[in-house]
Amino acid sequence: LMQEYGLEFGSQQGAGNCCANGETGAKEALTRIVNKIGDSFDNTDAFMHIATVGGGTGNGSIPYTIKQFKNGFEDLTESPSQEWMNSVIHTTFAVWPYYYEQPQRHFNAICGLSRLLRNEDGSQNADLVLLASNSHLSSEDAGGNGQYDSVNSAVIRAVDMMIGAGRETRSVIDIKDYVTLPSQMDAYHFTPAIATDLNGDVYELDFMADKAAENTFVPLELGTSSVVYMIVRAPESMIDEGDITEPEVYKAYQKWTDKHDINAAGQATLTPKPGRGENVDVMLLLGGFDLNPLLDHSWDQFDQLSGRLTDDEKLPQARLDKIQTNIEDYVKKNSE
């Protein structure tokens, strides 16, 4: 895949861990980026952008590239985009730096999340922003094993279950379902919570949802969620034999949200996986929750650096102020 689709861009070797340089690199190479995408794909419904928001290149380039797609490539002068590109849905998976990492990475993370959520004028940028925290996923409390691979595996597992819900389900949750209502609610940040290989002959579905909720990808208070999607993946044999049914999944979804006093919009779906057995997987996509438990790990570092970046790295103060205002406004709205 890297050999076939990879594209190097920008005038520097990396972005020097500065998101502003990453954006500049994407702007310099926008024509090449768009042409490469057009040469590689004839059409698609959605893009999934994945970035460690503590870094510079992906963190700087992805919010800019999404904005260009959604605003008709206003910076594109050398070649036209293809018509299908104007209607693509842009989802992102933003991976938060380890809490112990250097202040620059936490500064970048705040800036990156703000720019994924909001354009400078305060309008929505990405259609959906999924969040994962390296430290939270790697902690023993979250069921991790402290290894980098555990974070990568968790992200891959979440994406696979999201895609499966729109591909092989009895009741489809497709990409438009994930983004339409949350965008209307101005609550389009999410995090997965997953439990796998639960014995479907032993455990009730609402208990399985509780086990999934123990494994959120970021720290949060469940009761602050305003959107919840529940995806249950069970062996085909269990579904065909009526051991797990869609009405039971819907009932479990309602029972679980009621139990946790979550007055949430959302959907539930049942999707098959090949083979026999009784091992069931459950994923909750929790959206619109209070972001403060995550951002509290980074605000001090952001404040520490925001006034004293070196000249070649510094964002214009007016833009930095807007970045901060945008994320503060979004967080406040979703914590009330």
Write out the residue ranges for each language-model feature:
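Tubulin/FtsZ superfamily GTPase core signature
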Residues: 1-336
